[in-house]
Swiss-Prot record:
The gene is SHMT1. This is Serine hydroxymethyltransferase, cytosolic. The modification N6-(pyridoxal phosphate)lysine is found at K257. It is found in: Cytoplasm. Belongs to the SHMT family. SUPFAM superfamilies: PLP-dependent transferases. Transmembrane segments: none annotated.
């Protein structure tokens, strides 16, 4: 491109074309990307979304996410930026912090919040960086038992998560017979391991956590207690499940699951008086704020994603409405309806049910596994994910399916609708068993998928898919009207 000279451009047509490019809508500017988005939008519209960590953000959240706030750099914190022109960014971040505390009914004298983490994993790692020295000890629920990768997962042969690479982690487990967390074993192991931090958080656990018990164990070992409420943050805001804030020192969360915002993260931390020195009577204050803020920036991140902070602020405002509370109660009611319907159809639900938004279906009694069932259901426009069950010997062939109700509840499905969803799932698993019988139990997943894609089963797959898509299309999809 020829550079402008004395305020005029030598190639006015080219410069005009440049201006036009900046003003073009996506469908004209990039047809390939636009078509991919349209295809994904249609997949979401005609499919049944049962992945427990997914939801449908509101139009308002998506509009904030696609705003001019994407353009602004703002390293630092409100009132302490490394760039000029941040007065409105400061206003936005302060508003988001205020709403975050209000949404969880927290006293700003006792709690603070950092809303800059890019997502949940960076938020968790920032807390570890702030509170646990390198190679310090942490304890989290084991991934195969329902924990999260960032809680320190490793195998016998390899440290998988960065958490397990830079810190020493010891997992706690569930009772393989009941599926419930074994708090007695956790207490015993904590006495031997002496962790600096205990994580109260899950990614596939259908029961409420015993925060008081976990805090007692943490106190006995001089450890911090951190809750990772990423999956249940919307339920907590609505008062549908117990709040971790009463017992925890730090609480992290994502904002796009049950909270139904955009993809981002938050870290809540205690502040104010921690204790009183019994000898001097002097108040001892928490120092978590400076440690955590420094770990987020400049420790691990650069400039915050201001468009995402705006989306979070919008979601938090929505989370304080009566409509949101009604929605969260329906999420739990729908999950119980799904669990009961599948139980009646002969399926085993780990822990026997659910207190929250998800269930884990154990397919071992059916003679199949989650990987095969997931592929068949996906071919029938039902999205869910394979997951390990308590007692599984290999994560490469997990026995379970994780099913969640937040996304479909956002579309307006009620208990009776989830009973129908359960029957769709059942028919998909019955088809899985037919294909598995045809291929043999020793067949690899690749061989199973090849048989699934063959002509023999396409009529059955298509018939179920058409029923699913016809049913799903009855319910509106939240979001932007153009997609």
């Amino acid at each position: 491109m020829t550079m402008p000279v004395n305020g005029a451009h030598k190639d006015a047509d080219l410069w005009s074309s440049h201006d036009k490019m900046l003003a073009q809508p996506l469908k004209d500017s990039d047809v390939e990307v636009y078509n991919i988005i349209k295809k994904e939008s249609n997949r979401q519209r005609v499919g049944l979304e049962l992945i427990a960590s997914e939801n449908f953000a509101s139009r308002a959240v998506l509009e904030a996410l696609g705003s001019c706030l994407n353009n602004k750099y703002s390293e630092g914190y409100p009132g302490q930026r490394y760039y000029g022109g941040t007065e409105f960014i400061d206003e936005l971040e302060t508003l988001c912090q205020k709403r975050a505390l209000q949404a969880y009914k927290l006293d700003p004298q006792c709690w603070g919040v950092n809303v800059q983490p890019y997502s949940g994993s960076p938020a968790n790692f920032a807390v570890y960086t702030a509170l646990v020295e390198p190679h310090g000890r942490i304890m989290g629920l084991d991934l195969p038992d329902g924990g999260h990768l960032t809680h320190g997962f490793m195998t016998d042969k390899k440290k998988i998560s960065a958490t397990s690479i830079f810190f020493e982690s010891m997992p706690y487990k569930v009772n393989p017979d009941t599926g419930y967390i074994n708090y007695d074993q956790l207490e015993e192991n904590a006495r031997l391991f002496h962790p600096k931090l205990i994580i109260a958080g899950t990614s596939c656990y259908s029961r409420n956590l015993e925060y008081a018990r976990l805090r007692k164990i943490a106190d006995e070992n001089g450890a911090y207690l951190m809750a990772d409420m990423a999956h249940i943050s919307g339920l907590v805001a609505a008062g549908v499940v117990p709040s971790p804030f009463e017992h925890c020192h730090v609480v992290t969360t994502t904002t796009h699951k049950t909270l139904r915002g955009c993809r981002a993260g938050m870290i809540f931390y205690r502040k104010g008086v921690k204790s009183v020195d019994p000898k001097t009577g002097k108040e001892i204050l928490y120092n978590l704020e400076s440690l955590i803020n420094s770990a987020v920036f400049p420790g691990l991140q650069g400039g915050p994603h201001n468009h995402a902070i705006a989306g979070v602020a919008v979601a938090l405002k929505q989370a304080m409405t009566l409509e949101f509370k009604v929605y969260q109660h329906q999420v739990v009611a729908n999950c119980r309806a799904l669990s009961e319907a599948l139980t009646e159809l002969g399926y085993k639900i780990v822990t026997g049910g659910s207190d929250n938004h998800l269930i884990l279906v154990d397919l071992r009694s059916k003679g199949t596994d989650g990987g095969r069932a997931e592929k068949v259901l996906e071919a029938c426009s039902i999205a869910c994910n394979k997951n390990t069950c308590p007692g599984d010997r290999s994560a490469l062939r997990p026995s379970g399916l994780r099913l969640g109700t937040p996304a479909l509840t956002s579309r307006g499905l009620l208990e009776k609708d989830f009973q129908k969803v359960a029957h769709f799932i059942h028919r998909g698993i019955e088809l899985t068993l037919q294909i598995q019988s045809d291929t043999g139990v020793r067949a690899t997943l690749k061989e199973f998928k090849e048989r699934l894609a063959g002509d023999k089963y396409q009529a059955a797959v298509q018939a179920l898919r058409e029923e699913v898509e016809s049913f799903a299309s009855l319910f509106p999809l939240p979001g932007l009207p153009d997609f």
